[in-house]
Amino acid sequence: MKIAEIRELSTKELLERVDAEVAAYDQKKINHSISPMDNPSQIKQQRRLIARMKTELRQRELNNK
C-alpha cells in the first residue's frame, strides 16, 4: 500500500487497518518461527507498512491540535 492510498483512508478505516496489519504481522512472525517462509522479506515489508500507517495517524493527530 502506497502512502497516497493510506492518506485517502479515513482515520477510522486507518485504525482498523493498523489493527488488522499488526495481527497479520504477528501471525507471520509466529509461522516463520515454526517453519521458514519462502519470502521472509514479507515480514519486513509488513512492519514498514504498519509504521507508515502509524506515522500518518500521528500526523493527523498533530494537525488537528
Swiss-Prot record:
Organism (species): Parabacteroides distasonis (strain ATCC 8503 / DSM 20701 / CIP 104284 / JCM 5825 / NCTC 11152)
Molecular function (Gene Ontology), one example: structural constituent of ribosome
Disulfide bridges in this chain: none
Family per record: Belongs to the universal ribosomal protein uL29 family.
InterPro entries assigned: Ribosomal_uL29, Ribosomal_uL29_sf
Domain of life: Bacteria
Protein name: Large ribosomal subunit protein uL29
SUPFAM superfamilies cross-referenced by the UniProt entry: Ribosomal protein L29 (L29p) (SSF46561)
Entry keyword Transcription: no
Keywords of the record: Ribonucleoprotein, Ribosomal protein
Gene Ontology, cellular component aspect: ribonucleoprotein complex; ribosome
This protein's record includes keyword Acyltransferase: no
